[in-house]
UniProtKB/Swiss-Prot annotation:
The basal body constitutes a major portion of the flagellar organelle and consists of four rings (L,P,S, and M) mounted on a central rod. The gene is flgI. It comes from Thiobacillus denitrificans (strain ATCC 25259 / T1). This is Flagellar P-ring protein. Keywords: Bacterial flagellum, Periplasm, Signal. Residues 1-20 form the signal peptide. One of its GO terms (cellular component) is outer membrane-bounded periplasmic space. Belongs to the FlgI family.
């Protein structure tokens, strides 16, 4: 079986020639990043799909604590049987330069055994950072994209029901200070380390703003001198982000996903002439019930046993010649000519790499 579609995506996306890209697409300003927030909360208003409180004692404890804070005191030892409440973990990303009062999206995930969060409302939940300080407060109605129904032992479910989103569901209460070029310089961090790309970024910036404006510290970091004034600095960084650079050619690499059988390679992969032989080996196990019937008027019992037959099938191997290829299209054509299954192809690529015929780094994920 040939697999001409197996490498179609890699061939179409990765075979084009290198083109100019904006600096903002290939690099980020050091220190300008999002910060993760997390918190614990309760979702109420569920239609009988909440936590089973007998199996999730933390949900019951959380409800009791919340009611106590509201002035509602429950008798000691009371056993609350609730079905419309779920304990959840609330997560969000605090974007750079976020200001107090700004709204951010939050994700709400069940941590108990709730069947669905659909239709629920998150009660006010503080969101903390890694330093333990509260940076935002989250509250609002959940949006759950899934749907499900069950009756008489039958169940139908579409998508995931135990995770929901609240667009603009949290309000920022505390800002994170970001020092942006206040010392007279900033660092640009390339998303992919490459000496050629770093050198080209330096050349483009210096050509636009003058010599010695930028200098490369290593294959990833480029230091850039900035104006001291805040307004001038913002305009300067905006101009730098808009400059176009032709990234260096990526290192030849083949990525293999051993779990799904997916193979992706970039345009710099080449293949030397080589010979490949592979054959399919399959083991077929079939089981049929055999009934042992006792003789008439005998005291034996009818017994049902299983009889298994095991058969090993092996198709004869065939030696095929792979022509050397200097382009991605040639490599794809050569590998498709083998006609191997995805799992066989994983082993063939590893063998080609071991033999030195595959001119690329092989990475298994």
């Amino acid at each position: 079986m040939k697999l001409p579609h197996f490498f179609v995506l890699a061939a179409l996306v990765l075979s084009g020639a290198a083109h100019a890209e904006r600096i903002k697409d290939i690099a980020a300003i050091q220190g300008v990043r999002a910060n993760q927030l997390f918190g614990y909360g309760l979702v109420v208003g569920l239609d009988g799909t909440g936590d089973q409180t007998t199996q999730t004692p933390f949900t019951t404890q959380s409800i009791a604590n919340m009611l106590t804070q509201m002035g509602v005191n429950l008798p000691p030892g009371i056993n609350m049987q609730l079905k419309n409440v779920a304990a959840v973990m609330v997560t969000a990303d605090l974007p750079p330069f976020a200001q107090a009062g700004q709204a951010i999206d939050v994700t709400v995930s069940s941590i108990g055994n709730a069947k669905s969060l659909r239709g629920g409302t998150l009660v006010m939940a503080p969101l903390k950072g890694a330093d333990g300080l509260v940076y935002a407060m989250a509250q609002g109605s959940l949006v759950v994209s899934g749907a499900g129904a069950s009756a008489n032992g039958s169940k139908v479910q579409v998508n995931h029901l135990s995770v929901g989103r609240i667009p603009a569901g949290a309000t920022v209460e505390r800002t994170v200070a970001t020092a942006l070029g206040e010392s007279g310089s900033i660092n640009l961090e390339l998303r992919q380390s490459d000496f050629t790309t770093a050198s080209r970024v330096v050349d483009v910036v210096n050509a636009r703003f003058g010599a010695d404006t930028a200098r490369a510290l290593n294959a990833r970091v480029v230091a850039v001198k900035t104006p001291l004034g805040a307004s001038e600095r913002v305009a300067f960084l905006g101009a730098i982000e808009g400059l176009e650079v032709s990234p260096g050619q990526a290192m030849a690499k083949v990525i293999i996903n051993a779990r799904t059988g997916s193979v992706v390679m970039n345009q710099t992969v080449t293949l030397d002439p080589s010979a490949v032989s592979h054959g399919n080996l399959s083991v077929v196990i079939s089981t049929a019930p055999v009934i042992s019937q006792p003789a008439p008027f005998g005291r034996g019992e009818t017994v049902v046993a299983a009889e298994s037959q095991i058969e090993i099938r092996q198709q004869p191997g065939e030696v095929m010649m792979l022509k050397g290829g200097a382009s991605l299209a040639d490599v794809v054509k050569a590998l498709n000519s083998i006609g191997a299954t995805p799992q066989d192809l994983l082993a063939i690529l590893q063998a080609l790499k071991a033999s030195g015929a595959l001119r690329a780094e092989l990475e298994v994920i």
